């Protein structure tokens, strides 16, 4: 198998690349070579916006793309040689916040007031792809987590736990979050390529949401600590002191579960995330959440 992964240096694309290296596949990563490359991959050093004939000679069985925009997709499709399958990792940000929940794959797509341009760019990427290749697969995950996550989400809670800090909770911590482990994302890609379902667009994620309070408790437990909470009921922008917007949403993932009926438990997934984090703290994009708490909320 020859897999091409666009990017391959950060979180999702890096994890996917290493997952297929572990399976013994030929994995080609397409990036500008500004970061350390994973072991076992073959680098195609290029800017995806200026590919020329770089890719023409290759024949890939599958292209896995984390494109952000329609332009990204258009330029890659123009530059590719022969390939069989194309999988785009899109996002739940394509659904407007006012759509009926849980969001179904056929729901109307539009700007989401929390995600803004990120979401509309992903809509463009999907639109361009399906116009050019109606047989491509599109995956719409919720919050992805696990090893290599460079976004300051679970890592923030781990930091609080490691420092024996009280956790500053938005209100009572009842808001639900929906997650999907990056390893389950890879497993589902395998299922798609094996089963080749006629459905082309899939929401992916854990069926069960988790309250913020419970999620924080799990993160602390993984570190070997017990969480104690300070509830924040003031009208403060939640992202100043917490990792997520004050926006609860849920994807309908029943189509995914028909094809792949099991997912990693949050406990196990967070254990894996923590095991990676303690050796890779420098790879996470920290935000000054703890500083804000200490300066403003304490």
List PLM regions with ranges.
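Active-site "gating" loop of Rossmann-like NAD(P)-dependent oxidoreductase/epimerase domains
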Residues: 91-117, 131
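Alpha-helical substrate-binding/gating segment
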Residues: 158-168, 175-210, 217
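Glycine-rich Rossmann NAD(P)(H)-binding loop
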Residues: 6, 146, 170-175, 202-210, ...
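Mid/C-terminal beta-alpha module of Rossmann-like enzyme folds, strongest
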Residues: 191-248, 281, 290, 294-298
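Conserved beta-loop-beta element that borders a ligand/cofactor-binding pocket
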Residues: 126-148
